[in-house]
C-alpha cells in the first residue's frame, strides 16, 4: 500500500488530513461534570462517556483549511453507519497513517449530531477492568480516562484522506475527502473549540473565530505529540 503524505498547514494536494484543533472533550463542562463525578467511584459497571465537539464546517481552521458543509455532512452520515456497526473506534494520539491500529484504540464514538455548523459527539472510553477496580493504567483508554478524571481537557483530532484546493482565500477540502476517525490528542488551547452548553458560550465562540486564524501552525505540536506517543508506548 502506498504511504500517504501528511499535508502540512496551508499545503494543497492529496494526502492525509489531520486537524489538531477539530474540537475538545472538556471534563469541566456541565454536561460532563456528572459523568466525571460518577467515574470517580471506579464502578466497573459505570461507563466512561463524555460529550465533545468533533468538527466544524465552513470555518477556516488553524491549518488554513475549510470543510464545506455538503462534504462534512456527507461524511458524518457515512460515519453514523459505522457507529451503528460498532466500528467507530479511534486512537489516543494521532498516528501518521490512514489505518486504525487496534493496539492504540482508546475510545468508541457512540453518537454524533449537528448543532448548527458544529458536529457534536458522544465518546465511550474503552477502559480495562483493572483501571475500574484498582486504578491500574494499562491501556490507551485507561490513560485517557485517568486524564479526564484529573480534569484534563483533551483535544479531538479528526483524521481523513482527501485533496485540498485553493479556492479564493481558502484551502478548501475537496469532494474526494473520506473521514476516518476522531482521535484524542493533547493540543494547545484553541479559542472556540468547546462544547456549547448555552447561547452565551456560542456567542463567545463567534467573537473568537478571528483569533483562530492568528494561531501559529501546528508543526511544532506534531513533533511534541510524537514524543508523547513514544513515552506512552
Residue ranges and their predicted role:
Residues 101-103, 176:
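Short coil-to-beta-strand transition motifs
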Residues 2, 56-65, 96-101, 128-136:
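Short, surface-exposed beta-strand/loop "edge" segments at domain boundaries and coil↔beta transitions
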Residues 54-60, 93-96, 159-167:
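Short, flexible beta-strand-to-coil junctions
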Residues 83-100, 156:
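Short conserved beta-strand and strand-loop elements enriched in small hydrophobics
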Residues 3-18, 86, 110-212:
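Residue microenvironments linked to proteolytic maturation
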Residues 215-233:
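Charge-rich (especially acidic), low-complexity segments
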Residues 1-85, 207-216, 220:
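Polar/acidic, low-complexity leader/linker segments enriched in S/T/G and N/D
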Amino acid at each position: 500500500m502506498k504511504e500517504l503524505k501528511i499535508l502540512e498547514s496551508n499545503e494543497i494536494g492529496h494526502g492525509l488530513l489531520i486537524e489538531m484543533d477539530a474540537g475538545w472533550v472538556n471534563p469541566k463542562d456541565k454536561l460532563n461534570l456528572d459523568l466525571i463525578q460518577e467515574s470517580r467511584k471506579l464502578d466497573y459497571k459505570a461507563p466512561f462517556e463524555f460529550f465533545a465537539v468533533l468538527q466544524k464546517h465552513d470555518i477556516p481552521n488553524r491549518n488554513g483549511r475549510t470543510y464545506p458543509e455538503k462534504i462534512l455532512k456527507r461524511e458524518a452520515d457515512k460515519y453514523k453507519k459505522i457507529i451503528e456497526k460498532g466500528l467507530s473506534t479511534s486512537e489516543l494520539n494521532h498516528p501518521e497513517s490512514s489505518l486504525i491500529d487496534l493496539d492504540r484504540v482508546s475510545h468508541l464514538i457512540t453518537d454524533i449530531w449537528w448543532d448548527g455548523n458544529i458536529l457534536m459527539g458522544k465518546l465511550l472510553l474503552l477502559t480495562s477492568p483493572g483501571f475500574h477496580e484498582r486504578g491500574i493504567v494499562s491501556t490507551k483508554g485507561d490513560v485517557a480516562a485517568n486524564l479526564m478524571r484529573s480534569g484534563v481537557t483533551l483535544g479531538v483530532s479528526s483524521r481523513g484522506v482527501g485533496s485540498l484546493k485553493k479556492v479564493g482565500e481558502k484551502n478548501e477540502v475537496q469532494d474526494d475527502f473520506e473521514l476516518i476517525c476522531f482521535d484524542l490528542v493533547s493540543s494547545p488551547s484553541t479559542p472556540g473549540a468547546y462544547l456549547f452548553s448555552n447561547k452565551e458560550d456560542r456567542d463567545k465562540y463567534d467573537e473568537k473565530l478571528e483569533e483562530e486564524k492568528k494561531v501559529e501552525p501546528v508543526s511544532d505540536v506534531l513533533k511534541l505529540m510524537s514524543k508523547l506517543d513514544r513515552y506512552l508506548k
